[in-house]
Design a protein with these regions (language model features):
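Short loop/beta submotifs within extracellular cysteine-rich repeat domains
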Residues: 84, 114, 168-173, 280-285
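Short, acidic, Ser/Thr-enriched surface-loop or helix-capping motifs
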Residues: 108, 187, 358-360
């Protein structure tokens, strides 16, 4: 859990939150149904994976499969924390032995999964050998995966899933460009997902509503391949590897995972969150937190598609000490016109963070290091920043200004 000044502690009562009858959900094979519940630190989702909006015609459109009800159970952390490093959805490719090759990104609030990674790669035209370094972009008009009008299609099992922007679903939610998007889903790591209309200032809920745009661009020049063992020709978006992230783009609000830390209507004290954008990647291609293995793709005997929430998720502390730590933790001088910040934790009880991160005003992590009572900010430009202190099962954020 993260806190922004002023600190507002969130007290959670564990237990008593179970409410889902998964068998009743799975027995419904004709209409959309979904339920979620929290048990301890893990959030459980049960859905029959039937869409609640108009879809394309299946079988057809290059896809021979029919939509059918599923018995889907997924888990994620109810109180996610940032991992300190990003995890790609494409873990190692389908040639990776002994591990799950890819992750689905997450789940929409209607129970339909986002699975943006295409199981298609560059193929040697002479030998049929697969080059797993070049993954086809499912959203490219040059790639035909038999998707419908909202870039969704059906797996051989009958499961309907999204590859891109599910506009029919979005329209049904009544989302417009005049107000901040509601939560439209959750990533496999538990952080929320929003549509493209968000606050211009990540830390100010009174700022203008803007359309967040992708910070990815097509690479310049030509691919290095020979057209036989690897693709050649200009970078045109046929492959995921045709794109690169450029955080220096004007108006860039999002990080490499199409996300940022900031306030939202549902999280007035701030959270990390993801955003669906109009252009590539549209659906995020990496995680800022730790994804649950129930969203991985691969054989269950190898640990794929099996929940590991009990081992990766942490419950929020409901003890007064969480609030006390926030009140006792002080940084000075603020504002700072020196190259150092001092940290002081009042009281006799020895409580220390394990690490500290500096976030800029957009919520992007500038640096992370082991905790010290004196923190160098000499390299920072003038502006508003945040210090994120990571304790055992609590994160506390303090704002400061570098002059």
């Amino acid at each position: 859990m993260k806190y922004l000044l002023p600190i507002v502690p969130l007290l959670i009562s564990f237990g008593g939150l179970a409410q889902c009858d998964q068998n009743a959900i799975w027995n419904n094979t004709s209409t959309n149904e979904i339920c979620t519940e929290i048990n301890g630190s893990v959030k459980y989702w049960y859905t029959n994976s039937l869409p609640d909006h108009v879809t394309g015609t299946f079988p057809g459109q290059g896809n021979p499969h029919s939509i059918s009800a599923q018995q889907t159970e997924l888990t994620m952390c109810a109180y996610p924390l940032e991992a300190g490093e990003f995890t790609d959805l494409l873990i190692g490719g389908f040639n990776a032995l002994g591990q799950c090759p890819t992750f689905e990104f997450g789940l929409a609030t209607n129970g339909i999964e986002w699975d943006p990674v295409a199981a298609e790669w560059f193929e040697n035209p002479n030998t049929g050998a697969i080059n797993y370094d070049w993954n086809e972009n499912a959203l490219s008009p040059l790639v035909n995966l038999g998707t419908d009008m909202i870039d969704a299609h059906v797996q051989p099992t009958g499961k309907y899933h999204y590859h891109g922007d599910p506009t029919n679903f979005i329209t049904g939610l009544g989302i417009t460009s005049s107000e901040h998007s509601p939560i439209i889903g959750y990533a496999a790591d538990g952080f929320p997902l929003y549509y493209k209309y968000i606050y211009a200032d990540a830390q100010n809920s009174n700022s203008a509503i803007v359309e967040a745009t992708s910070c990815f661009i097509l690479k310049s020049g030509n691919r290095p391949g020979d057209g036989t063992t690897a693709p050649d020709g200009g970078y045109d978006g046929t492959y995921v590897e045709d794109f690169e992230y450029d955080g220096s783009l004007g108006g860039c609000l999002l990080d490499q995972c199409n996300g940022r830390f900031g306030v939202t209507p549902e999280f007035p004290n701030g959270t990390y969150y993801y955003v669906i954008t109009a252009d590539y990647p549209v659906v995020p291609r990496c995680f800022a937190g730790t994804p649950d293995m129930s969203f991985s793709i691969g054989p269950p005997p190898a640990g794929c598609e099996v929940s590991n929430g009990e081992s990766i998720c942490f419950a929020l502390s409901i003890e007064p000490s969480a609030t006390e730590i926030a009140d006792r933790l002080m940084i000075y001088p603020v504002p700072s016109n020196t190259g150092m910040l001092n940290v002081f934790i009042a009281g006799n009880q020895v409580i220390q963070p394990t690490q500290v991160s500096i976030l800029d005003n957009s919520g992007k992590i500038v640096k992370t290091e082991a905790y010290h009572q004196r923190i160098s900010i000499n390299e920072l430009k003038s502006g508003v920043y945040f210090l994120k202190f990571t304790f055992d099962k609590t994160e506390i954020i303090k704002r400061f200004v570098k002059k």
